[in-house]
Amino acid sequence: EGKNDKAEKVIALAMKNFPIDYYGIYITVEPFADLYYRLGKNKEAADIAIKLANKAIEDLKFYQGMGVTEQQENGYEIIQAFETIYRITANCKLNKDTATVAKLNGLVAPYEKIFARYLNAYKQQEQQQMEMMRKQQEMMRDTATQAVDSTQP
């Protein structure tokens, strides 16, 4: 609403107080990339996106160094790192930043191969949950239809 300069100052202050290199709760920083995109500051948005993705990649490198048993114990955290990268990539796609999307895809691709067993299991679990939700909705519709039918003479 014409207050782009003020918005940019607020974002800069937030980034100063929550520096990506030292602040471990990255999900709170992710929206700032989107805000920079909205302000037309694509370079700043891309910089945040790449920094956040690199933090998730650092986590994946850490898990890569573990044995299989330790990796299995940290499966949730491994998936969380991928979800972080996928959220960031989706935001860049939404803002039509194809160069950053390509860079992010290049960063994550090797780790998708390394952790394919976890990603495949996660995707399969998500598909099962979606199917269960679909069946529940179908049952609810059937129940509602039966209830309406039973009230009609």
Task: For the regions a language model picked out, list residue spans one by one.
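C-terminal luminal/periplasmic domains and tails of membrane-associated envelope-modifying transferases
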Residues: 1-153
